[in-house]
């Protein structure tokens, strides 16, 4: 049948699979959030109706469509529909400031913005240009609700299969106050992740619990394979430990992706051991350092496999630690996955011999097409070998042991990872030094039980009587939520 044949291809059509699952298992659950649930028939029909009107509005092949709001079913439908229509999904970071969001939107080149009421209010007064605004839920003013804006039932759209090089999505880097970097992922890159790398992990019976935002690549690493293989995904609007445990037990969740701070909150929750989590097949973790002690606790008390994924949104090398198979390697991030190559470079970009400590650098079939509109930034990430092959530098200092397991021992990049999000100290230092009372500033990451790391600023003042609280309030007012 079409689905089995398509999933066996080295490159296939993700959008066509969404429609095919609607025919293959029309009455099976596909999506759920806190207020509703959709079958695969309903998902296939709704995404077709959205795709049809996007094309009628003039959406060009590969053109971005921006999405901004709390993760829920309408958000997921738009994401899937954009891909089915031949567009490029551009989810925007909800924690960003209005100015940052405006910069992302402009950079994306989108002519449509799907948004919820709360984020639309945040954008009041922000110039977005000639854009069609559609509300993800209820209509606001002249902006129609998604349910009313969709094309008529049975509407058809041009479902020409994508090329492997066509853009699938743009993921905007978090934690920067300057021009955002839009990381472009191609259909070929995503297909390799969804149908290639995860072929043996996901199937039509998968039940995933999604508790991180849909604008994050962390989330897509589970959400997209679940959809590709015809499974079921419950989307949480906001992570809450007790609600997560309730959903996991009720839905008999099989797959999930969490960042370390979420694992910590779950494992320390007083009710954790009272829940039946025996349905779990695999739990993933990525985006931030995952303490060996926490991994051990998860292995001991939470049924199912535990897999740590190390890599960048930009791609390059991906390492996986199957912690349940290698309990003596919990201090590492695992080994490069099949088809991924890893080398180590010194500070001058010279290749180092095996066993050396240096900048982890990799290449694989899952590499970004580049940063949108920023070729110079793309080149800064790249390293070329003698044969002209492109490798991507992670910015992490690491070492590979005799068994091929990778340990992270530091960073070459000046970056703080807080709650799974990247924060660049230089950006914060520039804002602090722009304050009239500040002559010099330094920002460092401090250990945090709640977030892993949190940024702390140190300043030299022109006047000892200046108020640090006032400076802090002004600077935080210019930062996104995750940067404060």
Question: Where are the regions a protein language model picked out?
Answer:
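Conserved structural elements of the adenylate-forming
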Residues: 44-49, 164, 183-204, 211, ...
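Conserved ATP/PPi-binding loop(s) of AMP-dependent carboxylate-activating enzymes
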Residues: 335-339, 350-383, 421-423
